[in-house]
Amino acid sequence: MSKIEKRKKHREAAYKAWATMKKEKREKATIKTQKITEFIEPSVIQKIKHPETYRFQQVQKLAWKGNRIVLPFHKTPPDIACGVFWELRWAYGCPLDCNYCYLRGTMRGRMKPQYVKTEHVLEALDEAFTKIPWPTIFNAGELSDALMNPKMIIPIVDKFEEQNKHKIYLLTKFGIKNIQFLLDKPRKQVICCWSINAPTVAKLWEKAAASPYERIKAATLVKNAGYDTRIRIDPIFPISNWKEEYHHLINELLSHLTPNRIILGTPRGLWKTIEYAKRANVDMSWAQFFREHTSWGKKLSFEQRKEIYQFLFNKLDSAGYPLSKVTICKETVDMWNALGLHYTPGMCNCYGKNAFDP
């Protein structure tokens, strides 16, 4: 065997070992979440300040202000084109521990999952279903990964099937091992959404999450089972070959399924996120791209964000995906205007009234 062949064989063996270690790490994280070790009181989870809450903005007036578990997200900076949506705080924390995760900015960097006892969640939903008269999306993936513990989320998901007005939104980065309950029993009041990213981004900063391809596979299975299935490509990082990677991601995605909606977003560097990520000693290379300071933390430069959105809009359009089903998340009013997009002031474009139907 030649030296070149030996080196090639060595590289292949090293890559296989790395892939095996990564897979084992994900499996251990998944198994760990099945073991409920800690609960959180409703009064405590109510007081957790969403890391993206903007304290200087005047609170929008609501007919019902929520309870301890179902709460409105309604404090956004005046220059951001975001509005009210409803959080379902059934749990806090996430075992996937992505380097850039904004949850690092809450609970002093604590990421270990804590769960509200199911009976409290169901009682809170009973009240919410009565007090909120209009069809509403309840986002179960704001302070946690919605599929991090299927055993805990199943009775909550099934609660939504007792009525036909409101829907639960399951936002996740888990793969096929956490979706069996969705495949076993079709449900009409459930929206599934996978957050996916370019392969290089996933390898660098989403190491414990399922690979992008595994997430696409899971989304495809759920979509084929009849669920309203959406995709969130966020945060989009301008890595050296970002155009090639995200173009490939779109091609891979659309070759497997046609999502009901697609959400795009770029990194947001809240100061607490950055501070507690440093304290956790994670790889901070994700923060190198920030160039602009906004009322919602650091962002990529305006022109770079605009270029990213235009590029992805063009690729989606070329692939035949309807742009009316694409939105951008937590962006400035100026960006919406620059892209020629329409938004409804005071309403969330991703989880609000306009996004309720597939």
Regions found by a protein language model. Name each.
Residues S144-L147, F174-I179, V190-A210, P235-S240, ...:
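Conserved radical SAM core fold
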